[in-house]
Every structure is written in structure tokens, then in C-alpha cells.
Amino acid sequence: MKTFHTVAELRTALKIERLKDKKIVFVPTMGNLHDGHMSLIRKAKEEGDIIVSSIFVNPMQFSDQSDLERYPKTLEEDKRVLEANGCNYLFAPDALEMYPDGKRSQTQIEVVGISDILCGASRPGHFVGVSTVVTKLFNIVQPDTAIFGNKDFQQLKVIQDMVRDLSSNVRIIGVDTARNEDGLAMSSRNGYLTEEERRIAPTIYQTLLWAKEALLENRASHEDICEQAQQKLEAAGFRRDYFEIRAQENLQTPSEEEKRLVILTAAYLGKARLIDNLRVEL
């Protein structure tokens, strides 16, 4: 695996691969890699010839400077893991390479109607940062296909809508959430949990399963299911952010006729903000 830190070097290497008619698949990350990321790499290997990953902790998507500063940075270990799993190229730029004039002078991309709800409501500007950096990375890598996890379902929808709205020819593939044996979704933020919090954390997945069953059995209104779910999480020790039932297609409040739903939640446990979701087909 070759590692590049500048746009020019990566573009030169990938130009050679394209001249060989190789299909390029891209897996963007923020590092601190775990088995969930490796499931994306495995999917990428099924979809093309050349696997490119990136590691960049994007300051534009952090409204809390302290959260940015404490985000785990494990580049050398990440490089070993990526190489062992068949990644061909790693792009690991610094903030100056990505935002040479500073992030405040950076042109911004906002996907309207979906960026300021759910996680976007509690993290203002987050998805503008995501959309902007992913657009830049797509322009740098110019992949045929890009792979994202379904764990951050809203992020996936933002990127899908962005690609559609900007007439990009990158194919977006979502991969099912990778989970620990107890159901907790794999996440770099799980490392913020204490031993006791880690024991409690799977409650978030168990509550999603309960809500899915309640939906399928039509036990109560969406509002009542969400409120009961919030109470279950709070009883276990979580602090609420949101627990919502939305339409898969656009993440808006679903009509009574909507059959393809997604249950999404974000909740705080100690210093960690955990997110998860489950799709439901009625």
C-alpha cells in the first residue's frame, strides 16, 4: 500500500491506474479504524480493482473544538490494518492540504432539506462540513464507486442526495452496520465509554429492536413509540438527543401510507454520543 499526503501525488498515481482501465473504489474515513471500517474495505474489493481509502479528521464537521481535539488519531496502526486488508492507496492529508486558505474561506456545500434535521439539528453545520469534504475528496480521487456505512444513515442520505443534485457520476453503496456480539454498533466513539458505560451501551440497539417490533405490531402511534423508547434509554442511563421514526426515502416525517421507514436515534452516554438506526419495511 502506498500512502500519499498531497493531492498532486495521489492524482498522479491514480491517473496511471485509470490509463490501465482500472475501476477505482473509494472508502473515506476519519481513522481510528475498527472492524466496521474493514467491512467497507471488503465490500470495496468486491466492487473494483483499486481500493483507495482516506484518513482525514475533518475540522469542518466539528462544531466543538474539544471534540475535534480528542478524536483518536492512530495513523500508523490504521496504515497497518488497511494494508493487511488489501487497500492499495491511502490518502492522509493534513488540514492545510485540504483547506489551504483555511476552513472559513472554503466554499461550502449544503444539501438542503436534510442537513439541518436529526443529527444536523443538534450539531449545526456538521453536514455542511461532511458534504464539503466528501465533494473535495470525490474531486481528488475521482472514484467510480464510494462505500459508506449504514450506521450513519443520515450521512449516507446526505451524500446520496448530494451526488444526485450535483450530477456526480460516483456510484454510492451503503454497507450494513457492523455490530459487536452484544449488538452495539461498532464506532470509534465507543472508545470514550467507561467499562460500566460499555456494559450499558447495547441498550441503544435493544431499544431500536423494541421500537421496530412495536411498529410492526402497530402497538402505538409513532410519537408514543418514540417517547417510550426515550424513557427506556433514560432509565438505562442515557441522556436523550433524539429518537425518531422517519421515511427512508427523505428522512421526513412519514405519511400514514409510508411503508419504508427507518428508526434513528442519538443519545449521550457519559462523554460519548452514540448513534444507531434500524430500517423497517411494513
Swiss-Prot record:
SUPFAM superfamilies reported for this sequence: Nucleotidylyl transferase
One cellular-component annotation, GO: cytosol
Domain of life according to the entry: Bacteria
The EC number(s) this enzyme carries: 6.3.2.1
Subcellular location: Cytoplasm
Pfam families, per database record: Pantoate_ligase (PF02569)
Pathway: Cofactor biosynthesis; (R)-pantothenate biosynthesis; (R)-pantothenate from (R)-pantoate and beta-alanine: step 1/1
Active site as annotated: 37
Catalysed conversion reaction: (R)-pantoate + beta-alanine + ATP = (R)-pantothenate + AMP + diphosphate + H(+)
InterPro entries with a match to the protein in the record: Cyt_trans-like (IPR004821), Pantoate_ligase (IPR003721), Pantoate_ligase_C (IPR042176), Rossmann-like_a/b/a_fold (IPR014729)
GO molecular function, one term: ATP binding
Family statement drawn from the similarity comment of this UniProt entry: Belongs to the pantothenate synthetase family.
Subunit structure: Homodimer.
Misc note: The reaction proceeds by a bi uni uni bi ping pong mechanism.
Record's protein name: Pantothenate synthetase
